[in-house]
Swiss-Prot record:
Keywords from the UniProt entry: Ribonucleoprotein, Ribosomal protein, RNA-binding, rRNA-binding
Record GO cellular component, one term: cytosolic large ribosomal subunit
Coiled-coil parts of chain: none
Function as written in the Swiss-Prot or TrEMBL entry: This protein binds specifically to 23S rRNA. It makes multiple contacts with different domains of the 23S rRNA in the assembled 50S subunit and ribosome.
Gene name per UniProt: rpl22
Record-given protein name: Large ribosomal subunit protein uL22
Assembly mode: Part of the 50S ribosomal subunit. Contacts the macrolide antibiotic tylosin in the polypeptide exit tunnel.
Organism: Haloarcula marismortui (strain ATCC 43049 / DSM 3752 / JCM 8966 / VKM B-1809)
UniProt key word Ribonucleoprotein: yes
InterPro entries attached to this UniProt entry: Ribosomal_uL22, Ribosomal_uL22_CS, Ribosomal_uL22_euk/arc, Ribosomal_uL22_sf
Length: 155
């Protein structure tokens, strides 16, 4: 049994990649996925590198209570710079572009047809407290799937 994606993809025109059980914020993953969908792989890589450097914020359209306003967010007010999740998405994009190149496509020019983050659980952890107690200190785990599609050629 192979890995299943949440959408069907034509293997003749698409390339796929997936992150499994990566320890990062699900909320950050959702915000990044919403922002890079529809961009080319090259544009998405440039965007994520700018997020990591702190030049371009990711708009937080959900779960944005207490999130500060950023002037560089286009069409929205609240935003942050989720560095850890952005690095994971860069790894995913690098993998997807490599898969596309291996299949004979131009990976950098392909558009992101589908990207979705799925919360899959938590890795259990404990944090020692006073008086010999311990509190749960769990890390969320996220699966991310990405499908690149060849751009349509206009006649």
């Amino acid at each position: 049994m192979g890995i299943s994606y949440s959408v069907e993809a034509d293997p003749d025109t698409t390339a796929k990649a997936m992150l499994r059980e990566r320890q990062m914020s699900f909320k950050h993953s959702k915000a990044i996925a919403r922002e890079i969908k529809g961009k080319t792989a090259g544009e998405a890589v440039d965007y994520l590198e700018a997020v990591i450097e702190g030049d371009q914020p990711v708009p937080f359209k959900q779960h944005n209570s207490g999130v500060g306003h950023k002037s560089k967010v286009d069409g929205w007010d609240a935003g942050r710079y989720p560095e850890k999740a952005s690095k994971a998405f860069l790894d995913l994009l690098e993998n997807a572009v490599g898969n596309a190149d291996h299949q004979g496509f131009d990976g950098e020019a392909m558009t992101i047809k589908h990207v979705a983050a799925h919360k899959v659980g938590e890795q259990q952890g404990r944090k020692p407290r006073a008086m010999g107690r311990a509190s749960a200190w769990n890390s969320p785990q996220v699966d991310v799937e990405l499908i690149l599609e060849e751009p349509e050629v206009e006649d």
